Amino acid sequence: MKRLLLSFLFTVAFGSCAFEVGEDELCFVGDSITYLWDLEYYFPNYITHKHAVSGAGLKQLDSWDVSDCKGRTTILLIGTNDIGYWKSTADGIERLREDYKDRFIKSAKRIGGKPMLIVSILPRNEWGKQDSLVNENIRAQNGVLRRSLKDIPDWEFVDVFDLFLDKGLQIREDLFKDGLHPND
């Protein structure tokens, strides 16, 4: 599944001219999902910079030195560790979504990637123990991000959320090894 996701990103990036002609370096920033990507395999003709740590969220990202991403095409996939346990029925959920969106934009701007491809937060069912309310919330948070990022120059929100779903808001079990990390 990682191949499908990365191929999709590559197609979107080139289809929307996100990669500059002659560009030879790409930056990837994220959590364990990004950490597990074999960038040398998927992008053999590029020098890649990877800033990704298992369990990372925005708080951790804000402490990383990502200065090598400034001005470079950057792919950002982070968020499941920040909001992956929220339920859409939680008290104050709208305030939480707006606060997360503001922190997300601030963190992404600090990276300084140009252009910036922001990948939607993926659905999940970690070890088969989460209910679909978690994915309902992730879908809603992706919507907040999509609407908020659309007018930021040189940023593209790449929504792959539905590609990972089966019926309803259940994940496609065949695409995840543990309900969280996409298969190879």
Residue map of PLM features:
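Positively charged n-region of N-terminal signal peptides that target proteins for export
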Residues: 1-3
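Serine-esterase "nucleophile elbow" of acetyl-processing enzymes
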Residues: 7, 16-74
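Repetitive helical segments and hydrophobic/amphipathic motifs
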Residues: 11-12
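Alpha-helical cap/lid subdomain in secreted, periplasmic
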Residues: 42-47, 62-184
